[in-house]
Amino acid sequence: MQAQIEERFKECCQILKKGDILQANDILNQLLIDALDNERIQFAVNCFSFWINIIRQLPTIEEPYAKGETLLSEWISFLSYVEKQKYTPDEHILYCFKCGIFSLALDNYYQLINATDFEQRAEISRKIGLCYKKLGEYETARDCLIESNRLKPGVA
């Protein structure tokens, strides 16, 4: 039974890293029935409880830029939330959330990359670069920040 739980938890983490927070949450809720005493799963449940309403409300925000900004600002709140939890933070779970949240932000910013206004494009390139930096893709981040500075010197 424990091996099955661990396998499903790995699947949940992989889906989470791709940014499908709702599907990952569904898998975790199924696991919770059999793993109430598992501290990693409890920590993940607490993390999902922070994000789930935010993710569900994203479709009500019309502008992709505002969606991206919401995700980035909530990430900062999330880190404060994690510090206050009774569970010891699990770095792997935090990494999976970081990948998922910043991937979602990237998806939203990329919808605006072809903005005709140079200033807007510079800002979008900067935001995309910052997301890639958080995801550990430093070369891509650097390229985006260089593009941002090319479009509007001093932005990035």
Language model: regions and residue ranges:
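Alpha-helical linker/edge segments of TPR/alpha-solenoid repeat scaffolds
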Residues: 47-75
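Residue-level signature for tetratricopeptide repeat
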Residues: 14-15, 31, 48, 95, ...
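Helix-turn-helix repeat elements of alpha-solenoid scaffolds
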Residues: 17-24, 54, 68-69, 81-84, ...
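Hydrophobic/aromatic side-chain positions at a characteristic register within alpha-helices
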Residues: 4, 9-19, 33, 97, ...
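Alpha-solenoid helical repeat scaffolds
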Residues: 29, 110, 143-147
